[in-house]
């Protein structure tokens, strides 16, 4: 990643944040990939650029539902030209918001940790679901299944809606739930017209200086969502997805114990992953 003259204030699994002033920061998406909450050694070339383009597309498309973190500035407004040229496709100028300490997950279909919970209890995050659902079943309605936000390296934990209310307050919990479901419904309906099923996704929200709920971070990318192709979707199977699933599947069968460091991922698996990210961008935005 290019070194920037701005002061780095945070380095996450994928994104780095730089201070511009007390109201704004620069968010840069790297090519880092995390799987099972471990950051892998090998980057995925151009991944940060593709993710930024997908996110920007959705932020604009969903702006009528709620405010987002954009300030209206470009990277050229806040960086010297030679630095801006290096990061222009993977960086955005965003508001400094007070993040809400909950992962806002919406599920439209049953898979992953949700399916595990359902098999054991018939519920997800305490929500009762109909009997007889299987892998990849479409849920009667999209559901909001929050998880607690853990520090980088810790696994996030699914929590009930009541626990979400306890952590962030009743009023805010309802606002977050309703916003997340509205965003998911609109995005899922659009994606379906492009041949993509959005199985589930994670939104991040923050509060601005006036306390207004604001959409932030990344939106509906293959990193924060499971995208399935309409063509390969079959209920009862685990459909292939447009994301790091290639890498996750390879790691699963490599015998790795999911503790850092992760094993080196083969070049062909990395290339297939890049191709999947690019395909998602092309399908959604063309």
From Swiss-Prot:
Gene3D superfamilies per the UniProt record, alphabetical: ATP-grasp fold, B domain, Phosphorylase Kinase, domain 1
Pfam families attached to this UniProt entry: SAICAR_synt (PF01259)
Keyword line: ATP-binding, Ligase, Nucleotide-binding, Purine biosynthesis
EC number: 6.3.2.6
One GO term of the biological process aspect: 'de novo' IMP biosynthetic process
PROSITE patterns: SAICAR_SYNTHETASE_1 (PS01057), SAICAR_SYNTHETASE_2 (PS01058)
Reactions catalysed: 5-amino-1-(5-phospho-D-ribosyl)imidazole-4-carboxylate + L-aspartate + ATP = (2S)-2-[5-amino-1-(5-phospho-beta-D-ribosyl)imidazole-4-carboxamido]succinate + ADP + phosphate + 2 H(+)
GO MF: ATP binding; phosphoribosylaminoimidazolesuccinocarboxamide synthase activity
Recorded metabolic or biological pathway in which this protein acts: Purine metabolism; IMP biosynthesis via de novo pathway; 5-amino-1-(5-phospho-D-ribosyl)imidazole-4-carboxamide from 5-amino-1-(5-phospho-D-ribosyl)imidazole-4-carboxylate: step 1/2
Assigned GO CC terms: cytoplasm
NCBIfam families the UniProt entry points to: PRK13961.1, purC
Family: Belongs to the SAICAR synthetase family.
Name recorded for this polypeptide: Phosphoribosylaminoimidazole-succinocarboxamide synthase
Organism: Mannheimia succiniciproducens (strain KCTC 0769BP / MBEL55E)
Recorded name of the encoding gene: purC
